[in-house]
């Protein structure tokens, strides 16, 4: 567990409310009965979070609970409103994948006021009561990315950051800075591209104008890395080494093609699955695991076969 992952443990119990399922996926069988869980995802425009949702849906089906999924489309205010709506719909637990860790505080407060247990997945919440936090060790992942980039090249590199307020972006950046000590690379520019491929392309294009001699790029996720690769053109994987984060299918394909030297693979389906498992336990008043760490691994051409689906 790294120091930036803060979990405020509360003995939260779900209020007995009539269930209304607005939309989403549900399962039958198991021991879930009429229990409904709400899942608030930051964005389903990112393949990584689509996989997280799929893992959550699979777990819900196996446990026999209903899962209602909403997409904030990377709008923190919208996400707070969605969670507040959940509290009026009779859900027995809420899972949140925060758009912004700080701006998620009102969502956490809404869940607390409604006496509904809250589980954070993939990203933490800076302030608020959380029954369980399910996430990768992003500090470790960022450090591994720096080490791998340092093995692949030397000289000046740039860092494409995610959403500034997201804990995953902060933690990966912290780990990347720590890992720089082990290699011969130096960060000459860092700029947010909000975990978005199109923004990654635009930001990378602009950065290249002032830093044309760079030798490497670390992007906080594969989507931004793929945008950077497009901006680099034929230089990607030859003159400029790119390291991503997530291990998405498109990211793995870039590793296979040689345009991305490595990606730090997460397990989004496992994250989604474990988040639902903890949410169901919390809804039933059972003991939950306060922090659930999901392993990350560096993927290169050498071990790519282990991760291809």
Which residues make up each language-model segment?
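A residue-level marker of the well-folded mature domains of exported/periplasmic proteins
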Residues: 2-13, 17, 23-309
């Amino acid at each position: 567990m790294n120091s930036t992952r803060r979990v405020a443990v509360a003995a939260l119990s779900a209020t007995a409310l009539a269930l209304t399922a607005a939309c989403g996926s549900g399962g039958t069988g198991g021991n879930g009965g009429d229990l409904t869980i709400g899942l608030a995802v930051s964005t389903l425009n990112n393949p990584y979070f689509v996989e997280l949702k799929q893992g959550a849906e699979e777990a819900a089906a196996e446990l026999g609970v209903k899962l209602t999924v909403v997409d904030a489309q990377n709008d923190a205010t919208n996400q707070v409103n969605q969670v507040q709506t959940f509290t009026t719909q009779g859900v027995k637990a809420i899972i949140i994948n925060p758009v912004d860790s700080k701006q998620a505080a009102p969502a956490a407060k809404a869940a607390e006021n409604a006496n509904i247990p809250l589980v954070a997945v993939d990203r933490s919440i800076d302030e608020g009561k959380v029954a369980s936090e399910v996430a990768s060790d992003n500090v470790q992942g960022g450090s591994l990315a720096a080490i791998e980039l340092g093995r692949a090249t030397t000289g000046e590199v740039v860092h494409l950051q995610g959403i500034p307020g997201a804990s995953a972006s902060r933690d990966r950046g912290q780990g990347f800075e720590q890992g720089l000590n082990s290699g011969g690379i130096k960060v000459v520019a860092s700029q947010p591209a909000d975990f978005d491929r199109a923004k990654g392309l635009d930001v990378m294009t602009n950065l290249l104008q002032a830093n044309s001699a760079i030798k490497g790029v670390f992007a906080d996720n594969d989507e931004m890395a793929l945008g950077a690769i497009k901006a680099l053109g034929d230089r990607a994987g030859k003159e400029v080494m790119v390291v991503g984060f997530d291990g998405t299918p498109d990211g793995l394909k870039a590793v296979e093609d040689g345009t991305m030297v490595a990606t730090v693979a997460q397990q989004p389906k496992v994250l989604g699955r474990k988040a639902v498992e903890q949410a169901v336990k919390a809804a039933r008043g059972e003991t939950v695991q306060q922090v659930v760490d999901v392993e990350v691994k560096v993927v290169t051409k050498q071990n790519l076969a282990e991760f291809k689906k």
